[in-house]
């Protein structure tokens, strides 16, 4: 794993939920694990899974899968939140992201982890209240919400933390009273134990 901050052991109380956020990509897949409970959020770890462009696609996807399995094994998340693929002009790039997304969904399905997918604008709205917010605004608020010393880097890791926080705001705020509930109506596709 390529963690970008100090890892923290997850809490042990039954009222705590652990969410892993994922920003999928073949070259770099961002991940961020947060803990929600008692009206607060806590960052457990974040980082990026980097693959080598000179390796076959199958080997790169296997590396993403294996690293995600390690993250799951260590932090035992109950929920996963994934940023959806946006329509890009570059078809090749979109296909690469789709491949990485498939590996993410498989890794979660194998461990019976519920998965939710959020559109980029829904993530921005959940964090800032503005669907067209700038990336820097989102990152700054993620830093504040998770009580981090600095804005998370690289961007893929920050995006992964943002989608994890979005899941709390959209689907868990009534239980954990964390942040605003303004985004409950945002677009989200839920997958419960492999069933859509």
Curated annotation (Swiss-Prot):
Magnesium among the record's keywords?
Answer: yes
Q: State the reactions this protein catalyses.
A: Endonucleolytic cleavage at a junction such as a reciprocal single-stranded crossover between two homologous DNA duplexes (Holliday junction)
Q: How is the cofactor bound?
A: Binds 2 Mg(2+) ion per subunit.
Gene3D superfamilies in the record = Ribonuclease H-like superfamily/Ribonuclease H
Spell out the CDD domains in the cross-references. RuvC
GO terms for cellular component: cytoplasm; Holliday junction resolvase complex
The UniProt family comment states:
Belongs to the RuvC family.
What PANTHER family is this protein classified in? CROSSOVER JUNCTION ENDODEOXYRIBONUCLEASE RUVC (PTHR30194:SF3)
Q: What is the name attached to this protein's record?
A: Crossover junction endodeoxyribonuclease RuvC
- Name its species: Treponema pallidum (strain Nichols)
Phylogenetic placement of the source organism: Bacteria, Pseudomonadati, Spirochaetota, Spirochaetia, Spirochaetales
Gene that this sequence comes from: ruvC
């Amino acid at each position: 794993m390529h963690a970008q901050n100090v890892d923290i052991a997850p809490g042990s109380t039954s009222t705590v939920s652990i969410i892993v956020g994922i920003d999928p990509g073949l070259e770099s897949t961002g991940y961020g694990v947060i803990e929600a409970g008692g009206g607060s959020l806590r960052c457990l770890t974040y980082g990026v899974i980097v693959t080598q462009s000179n390796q076959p696609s199958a080997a790169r996807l296997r590396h993403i899968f294996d690293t995600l399995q390690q993250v799951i094994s260590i932090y035992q998340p109950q929920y996963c939140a994934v940023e959806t693929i946006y329509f890009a002009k570059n078809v090749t790039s979109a296909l690469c992201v789709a491949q990485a997304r498939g590996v993410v969904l498989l890794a979660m399905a194998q461990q019976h982890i519920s998965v939710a997918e959020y559109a980029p604008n829904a993530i921005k709205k959940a964090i800032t209240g503005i669907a067209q917010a700038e990336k820097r605004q989102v990152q700054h608020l993620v830093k504040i919400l998770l009580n981090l010393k600095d804005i998370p880097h690289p961007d893929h890791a920050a995006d992964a933390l943002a989608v994890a926080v979005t899941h709390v705001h959209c689907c868990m705020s009534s239980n954990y009273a964390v942040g605003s509930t303004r985004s409950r109506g945002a677009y989200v596709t839920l997958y419960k134990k492999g069933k859509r």
